[in-house]
Amino acid sequence: MKKLISLVSLFCLSVFLPLSVMGEPIDREAVVKRHRVCTTGTLLKSPAQVGNGKFAFGMDITGLQTFVPFNTLSDWSWHSFPLPEGMRAEDYRPVVVETHGKKIAYELRNPDQPELSEWLTKNPHRYNLGRIGFRLLREDGTEAREIDLGNARQEIDLWTGVVYSRFELNRKEVKVRTVCHPDKDMIGVSIESELLNDGNMSIYLDFPYPDGRYFKHYIGRYDTISGHTSTFEKLAPNSVRI
């Protein structure tokens, strides 16, 4: 009898509990925002990031890549190493693997084409596309380091995709918002600080030369200046093309 009562009780719970839960809508925004990611310092192997599925920009505690050259990634590239002599990309032959009784062609490293397979693995160079950071100066005019920042805090709003960063330098507060365009390979940065007025805060760009590595936390060589060039074209008073 006790066993029967237990079974009946279990049945009632299984029927009425889902009905009661289904009657209350989930506040998805509140649930997501409860899990905002907050940090007070740069995580060297787990940076904050904004992106849209085809483009991604990693950042340090400042909201840009001021102190750490985190990767900027995309599904396109503007550079590839030359193909091995006498080879063409279209000459690659996929590797046929038997899967569940069927022979399927996969784009894996072909042991019969080691050089071409290696080239296809590393090219084109989809990252690191470039580095954007703040040039921060201390009151004595020397370059600031992350240790010079006070009251640093960064929050990733998972619901809106906005990264909020704030810190203090020279007893002045800096507020930064970093976003990524939902459809274009473009980031937007909003900066609020008196440091902009006294010349102790500006923006710098740096473009690394590909180093042939992949699947690494930091990719690109910043000491190979002679390997590539950048040109500036002024489009408007406040607009240039690099």
Regions found by a protein language model. Give the residues of each.
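Positively charged n-region of N-terminal signal peptides that target proteins for export
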Residues: 1-4
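A residue-level detector for conformationally permissive "hinge/kink" positions
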Residues: 6, 15, 43-45
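Bacterial N-terminal signal peptides
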Residues: 8-20
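Beta-sandwich/jelly-roll carbohydrate-recognition scaffolds of carbohydrate-active enzymes
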Residues: 24-242
